[in-house]
Amino acid sequence: MCSSIPSLREVFANDFRIGAAVNPVTLEAQQSLLIRHVNSLTAENHMKFEHLQPEEGRFTFDIAIKSSTSPFSSHGVRGHTLVWHNQTPSWVFQDSQGHFVGRDVLLERMKSHISTVVQRYKGKVYCWDVINEAVADEGSEWLRSSTWRQIIGDDFIQQAFLYAHEADPEALLFYNDYNECFPEKREKIYTLVKSLRDKGIPIHGIGMQAHWSLNRPTLDEIRAAIERYASLGVILHITELDISMFEFDDHRKDLAAPTNEMVERQAERYEQIFSLFKEYRDVIQNVTFWGIADDHTWLDHFPVQGRKNWPLLFDEQHNPKPAFWRVVNI
């Protein structure tokens, strides 16, 4: 079946790269899908700080590097992520007595990590999510409260971009976030990136995570976000796309399979979204799914632990869903 259906990466070859998030299990279990349908890979977790440098000075590149070796040697890699408030080991922020370090020490640790990691993958990783999810979700606060910000100050963001650019001047550098289409947060992200661009900080793009549902955000909200971000003169990547069968506040656990209505609505939704992406292909250069098939999705564990979800284009048996056919036939 896999070789007899259209290839996503070939269908959209003149529009944008097609990518998928992977881990050591899915690189094996979903290998045929990944080889045929995508030309960009993102490590789901294994390029995050806690995996690459669990202890100071001890780097563990062995697992992360698998995505850049045969049979995926022709696939580009999106680096994800260098600085984030989650999945960062406590030693990064503490001294030997368990007390918070000062600004200078933390900046040096940040620089050391970014320089080592970015230089290690130079030439293979074509872009990096340098900063992930630093903007506050709601309220008057502009930036999220985090230990990075608490110790260094608001300029921890610009410093990270400067360090990454120094380590690999050819790599494209991104700010990446979720809820990126809702107006309140959209404007905060816009303001952050504009402030960096105005200072001459090397930031080349915005990553729109695109963890969306059957109804939210609206197409008008998605379009408005794309146009607002594009007005800054930056590249846009769709970095973590999936379409949940459930709204975020829907916590039901009674479905063993999606209803026919859900499947049809998801197909319609994917068709509408990809039609929109194609309309803006001059600024959208990559569309990456957070997975490739429904047998492995983070949404099985969030926001409801242990509830099965079906957010991707291929089902649990790796067969194309109605959404797949709607997308490739746009």
Curated annotation (Swiss-Prot):
Q: What catalytic reaction does the record list?
A: Endohydrolysis of (1->4)-beta-D-xylosidic linkages in xylans
Which top EC class is named for this enzyme in its record? Answer: hydrolase
* Transmembrane annotation, as ranges: none
Q: Which InterPro entries match?
A: GH10, GH10_AS, GH10_dom, Glycoside_hydrolase_SF
Q: Among its keywords, does the record have Cytoplasm?
A: yes
Active site residues per record: 133 (proton donor), 240 (nucleophile)
Describe the location of the GH10 domain by residue ranges: 2-330
Listed pathway(s): Glycan degradation; xylan degradation
Q: Name one Pfam family in it.
A: Glyco_hydro_10
Give the UniProt entry's GO cellular component terms.
cytoplasm
| SMART domains associated with the record | Glyco_10
Protein name per the record: Endo-1,4-beta-xylanase
In the UniProt record, the gene name given for this protein reads: xynA
Where would you say this protein principally sits, based on its record? cytoplasm
EC code: 3.2.1.8
* Paired cysteines (S-S): none
